[in-house]
């Protein structure tokens, strides 16, 4: 259900998991395994389909729910090394629970997957000239074109194997609220921060269960993202472009508080909904002094019309921080669907053009 909802609504599986209250009511081990399956299938969906489609007579006519069930069992065999007989049996029952008439198809296809999974994993089914790239693509669960670019970016072929960790759970880091009026009971138990406000890594399940995020005592943010936001925190007026739901807004405001900076912060995002979410979390955390504005950062003059009118001249800022739309490949472990929603044209053409336009617009406001 999590995977179907994520696929149908264009969401990330991790976000769907977080929103499911029922997931918190089941045993922790069951919950962790369910999350492992959901995120793993999301991360490797293209590879799983490549294997499955070899044994489906009419791949495009397979019902979405049936395909998703087949993906789950195939993921278990290919990446979790679940014995074939176990994965096949579970997969057939899963298909039967949602589409009884497709149980026979599932049984036949999954038995063929079990018989061929080892050859597929080692890429012995492809020409030797392509075997290395295909094997790495299947190992990493990534599109072939992306694997080729990763290989080209390393000095040695062995270096690319680091990306095999793409399928491992991403470490969780959090940033502590500097505006809190009293110590948070959970954060007080943690070891000293890596740098001011940043605790990493922390146990994901324990941290989420503590309620620290619900009470806005901290935000979840990758360590490197916190470093970037911290480096961009300066006194004076700041325009944050691409603020989203405000994770970096939160971090920058907290770091400014710790540094004793006097500043005014304007957070801009394309979507009204995200601006509202940003302000709601800041309010809950007791963080004041942030204004939000929604609009297209490629048309800053239009977006900042009210600011300019207030000043009687174009508004200028001491710092402009741009979190521009990007490939997202730096967060693949956290949002594993990204590689399969991305095209090579996005990386080489569309995204760079958008980023340059945003940069030019922002440069006129410094």
Where are these regions (language model features)?
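S-adenosylmethionine
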Residues: 1-366
């Amino acid at each position: 259900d999590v995977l179907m909802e994520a696929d149908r609504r264009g969401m990330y599986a991790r976000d769907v998991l977080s929103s499911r209250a029922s997931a918190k009511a089941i045993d922790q081990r069951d919950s962790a395994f369910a999350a492992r399956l959901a995120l793993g299938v999301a991360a490797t969906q293209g590879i799983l389909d490549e294997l499955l489609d070899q044994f489906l007579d009419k791949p495009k006519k397979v019902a979405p729910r049936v395909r998703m069930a087949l993906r789950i069992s195939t993921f278990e065999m290919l990446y979790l090394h679940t014995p074939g007989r176990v994965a096949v049996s579970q997969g057939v029952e899963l298909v039967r629970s949602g589409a009884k008439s497709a149980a026979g198809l599932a049984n036949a296809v999954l038995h063929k997957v079990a018989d061929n999974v080892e050859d597929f994993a080692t890429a012995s089914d492809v020409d030797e000239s392509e075997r290395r790239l295909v094997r790495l693509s299947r190992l990493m669960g990534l599109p072939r074109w992306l694997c080729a670019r990763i290989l080209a970016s390393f000095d040695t072929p062995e270096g690319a194997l680091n990306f095999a960790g793409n399928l491992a759970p991403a470490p969780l880091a959090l940033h502590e609220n500097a505006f809190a009026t009293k110590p948070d009971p959970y954060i007080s138990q943690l070891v000293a921060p890596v740098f001011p406000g940043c605790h990493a890594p922390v146990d994901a399940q324990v941290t989420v269960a503590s309620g620290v995020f619900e009470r806005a005592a901290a935000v979840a943010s990758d360590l490197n993202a916190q470093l970037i936001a911290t480096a961009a925190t300066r006194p004076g007026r700041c325009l944050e472009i691409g603020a989203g739901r405000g994770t970096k807004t939160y971090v920058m405001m907290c770091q400014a508080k710790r540094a004793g900076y006097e500043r005014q912060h304007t957070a801009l995002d394309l979507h009204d909904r995200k601006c509202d979410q940003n302000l709601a979390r800041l309010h809950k955390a007791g963080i004041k002094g942030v204004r939000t504005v929604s609009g297209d950062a490629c048309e800053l003059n239009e977006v900042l019309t009210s600011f300019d009118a207030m000043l009687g001249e174009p508004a200028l800022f001491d710092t402009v921080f741009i979190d521009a739309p990007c490939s997202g490949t730096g967060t693949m472990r956290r949002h594993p669907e990204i590689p399969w929603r991305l095209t090579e044209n996005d990386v080489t053409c569309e995204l760079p053009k958008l980023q340059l336009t945003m940069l030019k617009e922002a440069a006129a406001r410094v």
